[in-house]
Amino acid sequence: SNSITNDSKSYNGLINVFNSPISEFTINSLANGCMPLLVDFEDISLTNNSIVNWQWDFGDGGASSFQNPIYDYTSDGNFSVSLIVTDANGCQSLSTQLNSIDVYKMPVANFLADISFSCNQTELVTFTNNTLGLANYSWIFGDGITSNLVNPSHNYALGVYSVSLIANVGTCIDTFVRNNYIEIGAELNSDFI
């Protein structure tokens, strides 16, 4: 004969349920600029228990386990930063700041003109921008006129002019100056024997 028994056991005790920490952080320095860019991060996570572990992901392959790291971004790009905190109970929390870091390559300004010397009383000069890196441009033609074009042309009157090109990406700025570069209405000095 088959007999069925109902065995039951009961346990007395407490089941502890812990609140998870709330992962949060701030950036205490410039979050955009030229590479290399040094960025100061501060953990401001909330918890009822002590946090025992920090796992930072800086978005460029770099990581840290310090509570308040300072990180050096050495490549250009836009980066998201994440922090996972673990409290003494083993509870974890993740926070991410998307696209929070912008690192730019420093532009290197340079240019040439198609004409730098002319005997004419006026001359249309075309400039070729040879700047390394993408940038915004400000030209100063030396006669009170400016331009923001990449490769501008400018009509010069009689005189000698210094020309400047300012290239900027965010807060990264480079200036290139050619002093006394454009000479219009100059006389040729020829000595014939």
Where is each model-derived feature located?
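Extracellular/lumenal mature domains of secreted and surface-exposed proteins
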Residues: 1-193
